[in-house]
């Protein structure tokens, strides 16, 4: 990392690189991801991330990326430009915008993910995000968009008692999922968990197609004491 002096409000420059890949036992590479990035942090605590990714996707058998659009088997090598803006996270309101432009599965993809966050101290946290993807693939029906909207809420009654909620909507499948979790923790994340899950088949206002209620309790003790 580099901390320049008197450079237009720039506080720190953090270049970095990483790689991850997965192979089957027969040597076939299922995925590869080489990430080259530079984080530019300003005196205001805002950040801009400028990166480039080299990707590899190994598709063993054809699959439907969305209903009616099939991606053939093969190995797809692409590059993508990644730009990310993050405002000051220490403020009650913060904003993040992630943009990715590049190739995927033999075609092109534009991905935009704006995220708005609001918090009240360490007690209440909320996060609203939208993941929008615009695809242009060289297959029948390969021009389409797909979006996933998420709302996260968290309230801490005490450091060990929390109520959390996640609501997300997928416009491709027109499904809405809801997850509500209450946790009363002891030591080492043991304790009581109450979880409610629901999936609505036809989006907002649709009838639920799946519901489940989960109760989990764990307790850690020392058998030698």
State what each model feature region is.
Residues 1-225:
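Exposed, low-structure sequence patches enriched in small/polar residues
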